[in-house]
Design a protein with these regions (language model features):
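Glycoside hydrolase catalytic-domain groove-lining segments
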Residues: 1-33, 49-61, 70, 112
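Aromatic-rich peripheral "rim/lid" segments of glycoside hydrolase catalytic domains that contact
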Residues: 45-46, 54-58, 66-114
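Low-complexity, flexible helical/coil segments
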Residues: 1-11, 35-47, 98-105
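Glycan-binding loop/region signatures in secreted carbohydrate-active enzymes
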Residues: 11-43, 81-96
Length: 114
């Protein structure tokens, strides 16, 4: 059983691994990304898919994707304040709701009939 795996949604996130969430400057007001990061939801979706393929090939009985949503890291149309890029969530926090990201759709494609 894999209890937690995931990736953020920006170019270079796979190389940072669990440190992907550290790209936010929380001392800024309002908080902002700490560099010129580029949103790429396919990075996150591809990583999850690749890992699930490995887990399946190795006979892993189950795996928990980290995580569904991170409300403290909301999406913004302004790339400097799109904290969702630093989120491991498969959906983005938008206002009081959420919207699916490419990773959500990939998981749905794989497991939607189960």
């Amino acid at each position: 059983m894999i209890v937690e795996f995931g990736c953020c949604a920006f170019e270079g996130a796979t190389e940072l691994g669990p440190a992907g969430g550290t790209i936010v400057d929380w001392t800024a007001d309002p908080p902002a990304l700490a560099g010129p990061y580029r949103r790429n939801e396919q990075v996150q979706a591809g990583y999850l898919s690749q890992q699930l393929d490995v887990f399946e090939a190795e006979g892993v009985h189950g795996a928990y994707v980290f995580e569904f949503i991170e409300p403290a890291r909301p999406w913004s149309p302004d790339p400097r304040h799109d904290l969702d890029m630093s989120s491991f969530g498969v959906v983005k926090a938008v206002g009081d709701g959420w919207e699916p990201k490419a990773a959500f759709h990939e998981l749905s494609r794989r497991y939607g009939s189960h």
